[in-house]
Design a protein with these regions (language model features):
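Aromatic- and charge-enriched surface segment that lines or borders ligand/interaction sites
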Residues: 74-117, 269-271
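Structural transition elements
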Residues: 298-339, 356-360
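Gly/Pro-rich hinge or "lid" segments in bacterial periplasmic/extracellular proteins
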Residues: 144-207, 213-216
Length: 490
């Protein structure tokens, strides 16, 4: 389900703008100013990047998406995988008070309560206790082992804030005259729990993070005004190919996550699962992406990518291995025609898609495929009353449980399957890997049978990266930490 780590769609030149080798790094994130500076726990991609830069959690992610120390300088995991014990770095809060295990316990417990009602709370449901063991040692206990628990703890939403401030590694200031701009500078090494370093300011660069529309960001990059553009999606991908990008390159993350159409209501044409399946059967998924020229993008017909199971035979590549596309479409035609004959209504489906030229291309391709089976497609105006809504979301960790949690009925996003939720809930306390795998497979089967979602493939995330930018790496999580961009590479 993952495509090539660095997909070069514009040519890379050896000569870089020398002015970009020093001075502030200018970064544009495709986001709104309001979303960029959002507080709380429901963060846009831009806000995630800003939170990760200014408010660390126990651990963090490096440019390649690997877990690294943050407030916790080291940790151990017990042999049974049920206890994670962290030793905190010898450091202070911005007001000068020492960081203690009691502080972290309170902040983590508060954050877990704040997350209630979100999919991230479901991901964190294995946490049974947060204990302060000594002044700088804290323990998190789990209901059953979770190999990627540290990656989950590194999510920006788990960055810890006390009295309105985090512990860095960067500090933010804002310009009164520019509500879309955040200026970020590194904290001194000793305030980050590291040895003091003489003249450290001479080696660290400052960073300006600006929220922009996709078109504005691409134009600014082409004009040499920004060094890096983040948070490009399929909806905006055609904009990245506008104009000569001779001073940089497009990089596409090998993203893991959900990209498909969520069924909003069981009404009309979509009232029966067999007709929802008919729409899924009729799609030429590889053809949907062809207009974008994204080589290596792997379509999928499943909610949980088959590659996440240790045994590929547990989830074959195709849902309909004995049927080719033409055969599937003939079945879809019959099901749609039977409904039209029974009701006398026209088969029409409305889709809510984000703004952008990529959405127009995607809609056109879907309309072509469904038109072949007798279904007319409309774009929902303002998203109101849509039959289907695009779900475009990056995974936080590579387990079937993340995918299953995205359709939990408590989230009230669209159609769901209560029996799937119950199976995932049962798996929270199961220690045996084979039994847990069985529960996940049954939960996935329940969601598939309910036809709550029409999967298309992995999400698309692209960036524009100038050659002088260091410490940037495409990764499957789509998070690109800002702090390493400002640090010397030697």
């Amino acid at each position: 389900m993952r495509f090539c780590c660095c997909l070069f769609l514009a040519f890379f030149v050896a000569a870089c703008d020398p002015a970009r080798e020093s001075g502030p790094i200018d970064v544009a994130v495709i986001d709104s100013a309001d979303d960029l500076f959002a507080e709380g726990v429901r963060l846009s991609p831009g806000a995630q990047h800003l939170r990760a830069a200014t408010a660390e959690g126990l651990v963090a992610l490096d440019p390649m998406g690997q877990v690294v120390p943050a407030i916790a300088e080291r940790w151990i995991v017990t042999d049974d995988g049920l206890s994670y014990i962290f030793r905190l770095r010898d450091s202070t809060w911005p007001d000068g008070d020492p960081i203690t295990a009691a502080d972290i316990r309170k902040l983590l417990r508060d954050r877990l309560r704040e997350l209630d009602g979100t999919s991230l709370a479901l991901d964190l449901a294995k946490i049974t206790d947060v204990r302060a063991m000594t002044g700088r040692v804290i323990e998190l206990r789990l209901s059953s082992p979770m190999p990627e628990f540290l990656r989950l703890l590194a999510q920006p939403e788990l960055g810890l804030v006390r009295a309105g401030s985090g512990t860095g590694p960067m500090i933010m200031s804002r310009d009164e005259g520019d509500e879309a701009l955040a200026r970020l500078s590194a904290l001194p090494p000793e305030e980050r729990g590291m040895p003091a370093r003489e003249n450290w300011e001479a080696y660290a660069r400052s960073l300006a993070l600006r929220a922009m529309s996709a078109r504005e960001a691409v134009e600014a990059f082409s004009a040499g005004e920004v060094d890096l553009v983040l948070n490009g999606k399929l909806a905006t991908f055609p904009l990245a190919e506008l104009g000569p990008l001779s001073r940089g390159t497009i990089q596409v993350d090998p993203a893991l996550g959900l990209f498909g159409l969520l069924v909003m209501e069981e009404e009309g044409l979509l009232a029966a699962p067999e007709r929802r399946e008919a729409l899924s059967m009729a799609l030429d998924r590889a053809g949907l992406i062809q207009p974008f020229g994204l080589g290596g993008w792997q379509p999928t017909e499943w909610i949980v990518p088959p590659g996440l199971y240790e045994n590929p035979s547990l989830s074959p590549a195709s849902r309909w291995p004995d049927l080719d596309l033409d055969q599937r479409r003939r079945i879809a035609v019959a099901r749609i025609a039977a409904w039209v004959a029974e009701t006398g209504e026209e088969a029409v489906v409305s889709i809510d898609l984000p703004p952008g030229p990529g959405s127009a291309l995607l809609l056109r391709a879907i309309a072509r495929d469904w038109g072949m089976v007798g279904v007319r497609v409309e774009r929902a105006q303002g998203g109101e009353g849509a039959d289907l809504r695009l779900r475009d979301r990056l995974a936080r960790y590579s387990s079937p449980r993340w995918f299953l949690n995205q359709f939990n009925c408590d989230l009230d996003l669209g159609l769901c399957a209560p029996e799937a939720d119950a199976l995932v809930r049962d798996a929270l306390v199961v220690g045996d890997a084979a039994e847990k795998r069985r529960l996940f497979l049954e939960a996935h089967e329940a969601l598939v049978e309910a036809e709550v979602f029409i999967p298309l493939g992995p999400p698309v995330r692209w960036s524009l990266v100038r050659g002088a930018v260091r410490a940037y790496s495409a990764n499957q999580w789509g998070l690109h930490p800002l702090f390493p961009l400002t640090q010397p590479t030697i």
